[in-house]
């Protein structure tokens, strides 16, 4: 059983309420198998897939591949499926009465397309206008990273980040923009090696105020 922090539970419940949570097969707090069991099952199935591809797992270059993939899935690229790994969030009272835009841009993100399990590489720009609280800047990067470490579609990823920050910061005034290269487009199918997909979500003043919106979009 995973153990959620209060902040993780609040974010998860907000995503469920708004229909933005990933399509989990069961409740992620009570239904998730422990990491060792998941690694064992995944390793077994990857072995079967490789054998169906006529690969000889006795070769020393391939023999540990199923184990490596299992560890990569559970402990690295899909770590965000387990809310036990939601970043620890420390809110700071806005004693300085900051009321201007705070922006973090060029946040590196790596995710995985849920349709083909191909890589997604991109950068995010996140901004918010504080009310009662501000948040450590690295926590914004960590929230982006957490939701990126899942099988994703970029549209949902953008909405998850913005709703998580709205929930944590208790403010509507949040904006998120992501530019990403999708290897399901670049390396297969159409094989377009230059296109970049942009998704943007604007809330609160970022949507209602033309000046605030233009300032954010200019940064992007």
UniProtKB/Swiss-Prot annotation:
<dbReference type="InterPro" id="IPR020602">
    <property type="entry name" value="GTP_CycHdrlase_I_dom"/>
</dbReference>
<dbReference type="InterPro" id="IPR043133">
    <property type="entry name" value="GTP-CH-I_C/QueF"/>
</dbReference>
<keyword id="KW-0342">GTP-binding</keyword>
<keyword id="KW-0479">Metal-binding</keyword>
<dbReference type="Pfam" id="PF01227">
    <property type="entry name" value="GTP_cyclohydroI"/>
</dbReference>
<dbReference type="GO" id="GO:0008270">
    <property type="term" value="F:zinc ion binding"/>
</dbReference>
<feature type="binding site">
    <location>
        <position position="113"/>
    </location>
    <ligand>
        <name>Zn(2+)</name>
    </ligand>
</feature>
<dbReference type="InterPro" id="IPR043134">
    <property type="entry name" value="GTP-CH-I_N"/>
</dbReference>
<feature type="binding site">
    <location>
        <position position="184"/>
    </location>
    <ligand>
        <name>Zn(2+)</name>
    </ligand>
</feature>
<feature type="binding site">
    <location>
        <position position="116"/>
    </location>
    <ligand>
        <name>Zn(2+)</name>
    </ligand>
</feature>
<keyword id="KW-0862">Zinc</keyword>
<dbReference type="GO" id="GO:0005737">
    <property type="term" value="C:cytoplasm"/>
</dbReference>
<keyword id="KW-0378">Hydrolase</keyword>
<dbReference type="GO" id="GO:0046654">
    <property type="term" value="P:tetrahydrofolate biosynthetic process"/>
</dbReference>
<keyword id="KW-0547">Nucleotide-binding</keyword>
<dbReference type="GO" id="GO:0006730">
    <property type="term" value="P:one-carbon metabolic process"/>
</dbReference>
<comment type="pathway">
    <text>Cofactor biosynthesis; 7,8-dihydroneopterin triphosphate biosynthesis; 7,8-dihydroneopterin triphosphate from GTP: step 1/1.</text>
</comment>
<dbReference type="InterPro" id="IPR018234">
    <property type="entry name" value="GTP_CycHdrlase_I_CS"/>
</dbReference>
<comment type="subunit">
    <text>Homomer.</text>
</comment>
<dbReference type="GO" id="GO:0006729">
    <property type="term" value="P:tetrahydrobiopterin biosynthetic process"/>
</dbReference>
<keyword id="KW-0554">One-carbon metabolism</keyword>
<dbReference type="InterPro" id="IPR001474">
    <property type="entry name" value="GTP_CycHdrlase_I"/>
</dbReference>
<dbReference type="GO" id="GO:0003934">
    <property type="term" value="F:GTP cyclohydrolase I activity"/>
</dbReference>
<comment type="similarity">
    <text>Belongs to the GTP cyclohydrolase I family.</text>
</comment>
<protein>
    <recommendedName>
        <fullName>GTP cyclohydrolase 1</fullName>
        <ecNumber>3.5.4.16</ecNumber>
    </recommendedName>
</protein>
<dbReference type="GO" id="GO:0005525">
    <property type="term" value="F:GTP binding"/>
</dbReference>
